[in-house]
Amino acid sequence: MENLHQHLSEALKQLRQANGWSLTLAAERTGVSKAMLGQIERGESSPTVATLWKIATGFNVPFSFFIQGNGLQSGESARFSQPNAQMTVRPLLPYDAQLRFDLLAVELAAGAQSDSSPHESGCVEQVVVIEGELLLGMRGVWRRLQAGEALQFAADVAHSYRNPLAAPLRFHSLIHYLKRP
């Protein structure tokens, strides 16, 4: 996990510098505080999945940009967990720049909820429940999905994933970035 946090730190710093952004500008573009971005860059803080999504959206890079890379061992790049371990995400395939999608395996702890800020404009997400039950909330409406069921939705609005059961929830998320170059 140490290498993953080091990778996150280096990836964020490299991305910010490649864009020529100050920490202040990066904070404005991502919606993540300047202090938090600085702590992540220095390896002093581990971001939540939601924070990492905000950063990826603000920099217009796929989520998997931060959890895959040359500086990681294959086992380490396979999982990214929030500090409180309520949600774990791992890429099933590397980001496909031609097709512009991420395919992720997600696990949500028993009784947990994860709230997601809107992804970039035009982003579409498809979820397939593998095990358990998923409550997917958007604009105050919750949809219930059982194992084997799937749903496609516009991910450019705030949305939430909730596990109502006393056992872990596992689902796959295919995120299609329609406007990404």
Q: Which ranges hold each PLM region?
A:
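Short alpha-helical DNA-recognition segment
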Residues: 20-38
